[in-house]
UniProtKB/Swiss-Prot annotation:
Annotated control of activity: Allosterically activated by HslU binding.
This protein's encoding gene: hslV
InterPro entries, per database record: ATP-dep_Prtase_HsIV_su, Ntn_hydrolases_N, Proteasome_sua/b, Proteasome_suB-type
Keywords, in A-Z order: Allosteric enzyme, Cytoplasm, Hydrolase, Metal-binding, Protease, Sodium, Threonine protease
Protein name according to UniProt: ATP-dependent protease subunit HslV
Keyword Hydrolase: yes
GO biological process: proteolysis involved in protein catabolic process
Taxonomic path: Bacteria, Pseudomonadati, Pseudomonadota, Gammaproteobacteria, Pseudomonadales
Pfam families attached to this UniProt entry: Proteasome (PF00227)
Function: Protease subunit of a proteasome-like degradation complex believed to be a general protein degrading machinery.
Top-rank taxon: Bacteria
Length: 176
């Protein structure tokens, strides 16, 4: 699996993910890019789960963004509806984290679209470790969103065998 972290702080939203691709207990690749920009660079998206499934979901989500003129929540809800009702999609094993200047969301294969209260998303195999680290850093430091995302992923990578330290980070100003 992998670990994805997204943090909103000090006028920025940051999403970061590690680069490990595993097949069972074997590391197949260490430098995969699991965080990318969508919809003319206005949306940051990351995935945890099966890589091929995630690419399918990225394509479907980007199509929904185009259809709904970049409206993040509407596109996420429509993707989640499709995911629940389309038989081929319902078998996909991946989760998406998406963020723009207005919101940060988790989209699951169960049809859930969740906007965390504190603007913090952590998911994947190392998600609980990254979330604990990021939450502590948010509460007890004045670090930037980027520093929190990067540090929490490094901590998750130290603990979770399915998370490495090859990190991809995307950052966006909330004022854009």
């Amino acid at each position: 699996m992998t670990t994805i972290v997204s943090v909103r702080r000090h006028g920025k939203v940051v999403m970061a993910g590690d680069g490990q691709v595993s097949l069972g207990n074997t590391v197949m690749k260490g430098n995969a890019k699991k965080v990318r920009r969508l919809y003319h660079g206005e949306v940051i998206a990351g995935f945890a789960g099966a890589t091929a499934d995630a690419f399918t979901l990225f394509e479907r989500f980007e199509a929904q963004l185009e259809k709904h003129q970049g409206h993040l929540v509407r596109a996420a809800v429509e993707l989640a509806k499709d995911w629940r009702t389309d038989r081929s999609l319902s078998r996909l094993e991946a989760m998406l984290a998406v963020a723009n200047k207005d919101a940060s969301l988790i989209i699951t294969g169960n049809g859930d679209v969740v906007e965390p209260e504190d603007g913090l998303i952590a998911m994947g195999s190392g998600g609980a470790f990254a979330q604990a680290a990021a939450r502590a850093l948010l509460l007890k430091t004045d670090l930037s969103a980027r520093e929190i995302a990067e540090t929490s992923l490094h901590i998750a990578g130290d603990i979770c065998v399915f998370t490495n330290h090859n990190i991809t980070i995307e950052e966006q100003d909330l004022a854009d």
